[in-house]
């Protein structure tokens, strides 16, 4: 952990030099996730845009949020904190629910603080990406088969968004009981006037068979393999919105094709 904290200090100095040279704002993003060993965190890549240069960290508990906040406050123009409450147990507020946003708010006084919801940004970005790929087609996403592997919070939101566009959405999750409940709930939530319905299967190869699009939304579990690409349509579009959902063999095969 100390190594990554030192890297934060190093990258802050690096983006500060770039920002002064190119007259750009600087920003640091603090994201949070429930999947962890509660000890480590990792840094996101440094990204430079027209008006801002930024990087960030994905963290697993409030004590790490506290340490990072003290390091970056006043060193960047903006600090963005993920406001989604994904962590159950607090390791700072005894007897209270975990709250990364609160921890950051209490320890930021110099930089401009803003909040965001990481999963919602991902859903909007993915929706824009996939819909734009079909912009020259008369039906758009209508009737396209889209397979979503990993029907958690993120996968479920994506499924709802795409079925509303008229796509044939199939979802997969290892826990069959939750998979059935999610499918039922999503079909209740979607507009009554939307004719398409979300389907499910606990057979992952059945879900991806003849798919136009395969979306991997598992958290740190490589799930998309070569066999899935062979079972899908020739020009299947594969998107990884999780954390490394595509196996190396599948990437190699896709490059070859």
Question: Locations of the language-model features?
Answer:
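A glycine-rich, Thr/Ser-enriched phosphate-binding loop motif common to dinucleotide/cofactor-binding enzymes
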Residues: 113-132
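Rossmann-fold NAD(P)-binding glycine/threonine-rich loop
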Residues: 100, 104, 232, 237-257
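Short glycine-/small-residue-rich Rossmann-like dinucleotide-binding loops
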Residues: 84, 218-220, 242-243
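Generic hydrophobic/aromatic pocket-lining and core-packing "Φ" positions
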Residues: 68, 158-159, 251
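N-terminal ligand-binding/catalytic initiation module
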Residues: 1-108
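Glycine-rich phosphate/diphosphate-binding loop of Rossmann-like nucleotide-binding domains
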Residues: 132-216
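Rossmann-fold NAD(P) dinucleotide-binding segment
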Residues: 209-210, 220-237
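Short glycine-rich, flexible loops that bind phosphorylated cofactors or substrates
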Residues: 87-88, 222-224, 246-247
């Amino acid at each position: 952990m100390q190594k990554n904290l030192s890297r934060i200090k190093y990258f802050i100095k690096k983006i500060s030099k770039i920002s002064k040279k190119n007259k750009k704002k600087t920003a640091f993003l603090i994201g949070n996730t429930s999947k962890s060993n509660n000890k480590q965190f990792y840094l996101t890549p440094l990204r430079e845009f027209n008006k801002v240069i930024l990087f960030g960290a994905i963290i697993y508990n409030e004590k790490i949020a506290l340490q990072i906040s003290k390091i970056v406050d006043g060193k960047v123009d903006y600090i963005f904190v993920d406001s989604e409450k994904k962590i159950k147990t607090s390791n700072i507020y005894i007897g209270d629910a975990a709250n990364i946003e609160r921890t950051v708010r209490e320890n930021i006084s110099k930089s401009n603080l803003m909040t965001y919801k990481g999963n919602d940004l991902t859903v909007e970005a993915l929706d824009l990406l996939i819909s734009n790929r079909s912009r020259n087609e008369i039906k758009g996403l209508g009737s396209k088969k889209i397979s979503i592997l990993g029907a958690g919070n993120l996968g479920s939101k994506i499924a709802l968004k795409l079925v509303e566009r008229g796509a044939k959405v199939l979802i997969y999750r290892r826990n069959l009981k939750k998979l059935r409940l999610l499918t039922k709930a999503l079909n209740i939530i979607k507009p009554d006037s939307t004719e398409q319905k979300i389907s499910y299967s606990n057979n992952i190869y059945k879900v991806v068979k003849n798919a136009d699009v395969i979306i991997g939304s598992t958290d740190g579990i490589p799930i998309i393999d070569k066999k899935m690409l062979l079972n899908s349509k020739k020009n299947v579009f594969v998107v990884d919105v999780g954390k490394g959902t595509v196996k190396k063999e599948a990437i190699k095969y896709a490059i070859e094709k």
